[in-house]
Amino acid sequence: MSKLDLNALNELPKVDRILALAETNAELEKLDAEGRVAWALDNLPGEYVLSSSFGIQAAVSLHLVNQIRPDIPVILTDTGYLFPETYRFIDELTDKLKLNLKVYRATESAAWQEARYGKLWEQGVEGIEKYNDINKVEPMNRALKELNAQTWFAGLRREQSGSRANLPVLAIQRGVFKVLPIIDWDNRTIYQYLQKHGLKYHPLWDEGYLSVGDTHTTRKWEPGMAEEETRFFGLKRECGLHEG
């Protein structure tokens, strides 16, 4: 696999970009997660960043990437509505893994947003999407720009939802390379990695949560529910960061 030209690929239509990356993705599928990270660091341009929501399995990708690339900027988009357990988990992992945490927030405070727009998350899909644009998408775009990112690592997995089932290891999103080292991992592999390295699930895992985001749009899992139904009232799975 040879080095890739981000500028040249960005000039192609989306379908042509996917085709141009197909051969590389076929080879990346053969590598393990550590090998994918190492390949990306050797062959894709910097600056490098890692994003995390500090959700249920967050410790895996944070540990995996940070041990290979210590001090990599870790981007968190903080909505102001995370669970108290999430904020404590962020502090715990940042200290334990010595993370170079970079927190980005909306330009409007949560209280100001509610005063202007009401509770957007109660206003159907359109309201949720506006909320996500303000609190997730814009802060992430700002983070990528300010950190001069050209290669973005994330911890998505195909098993998590139908919307992620066909994602490749390597893609281009928001004008930068996006690498998903653990995209093909199942829940058992996640558990084994956590056990091997003395890491923990998010604290709410033990209370029946399969996925954790904001307090107002996250539900405990109940028998018969798909994982994606525990977020955004089942109306959508993605918060906007990993779409487009």
Swiss-Prot record:
Pathway(s) annotated for this protein in UniProt: Sulfur metabolism; hydrogen sulfide biosynthesis; sulfite from sulfate: step 3/3
Keyword Oxidoreductase assigned to the entry: answer is yes
Catalytic residues per the record?
A: 239
Instruction: Describe activity control.
Output: Severely inhibited by reagents which covalently modify Cys groups in proteins.
Source taxon at top rank: Bacteria
Instruction: Please name the Pfam families in this protein's record.
Output: PAPS_reduct
GO MF annotation list:
phosphoadenylyl-sulfate reductase (thioredoxin) activity
Q: Which reaction does it catalyse?
A: [thioredoxin]-disulfide + sulfite + adenosine 3',5'-bisphosphate + 2 H(+) = [thioredoxin]-dithiol + 3'-phosphoadenylyl sulfate
Locations listed in the record = Cytoplasm
Q: What is its main location?
A: cytoplasm
**Assigned GO CC terms:** cytoplasm
Protein's UniProt keywords contain Oxidoreductase: yes
Q: What sort of enzyme, by top EC class, is this?
A: oxidoreductase
One Gene Ontology term of the biological-process aspect is: sulfur compound metabolic process
Query: Its Enzyme Commission number?
Result: 1.8.4.8
For this UniProt record, give its keywords in alphabetical order, as a comma-separated list. Cytoplasm, Oxidoreductase
InterPro entries assigned: PAPS/APS_Rdtase (IPR004511), PAPS_reduct_dom (IPR002500), PAPS_reductase_CysH (IPR011800), Rossmann-like_a/b/a_fold (IPR014729)
Q: Which family does it belong to?
A: Belongs to the PAPS reductase family. CysH subfamily.
Tell me the subunit arrangement.
Homodimer.
Described purpose of this protein according to its UniProt entry:
Catalyzes the formation of sulfite from phosphoadenosine 5'-phosphosulfate (PAPS) using thioredoxin as an electron donor.
Q: What is known of its domains?
A: The open, reduced form of PAPS reductase is able to bind PAPS, whereas the closed oxidized form cannot. A movement between the two monomers of the dimer may allow this switch in conformation to occur.
Identify this protein by name: Phosphoadenosine 5'-phosphosulfate reductase
Query: Which organism encodes this protein?
Result: Escherichia coli (strain K12)
Taxonomy of origin reads: Bacteria, Pseudomonadati, Pseudomonadota, Gammaproteobacteria, Enterobacterales
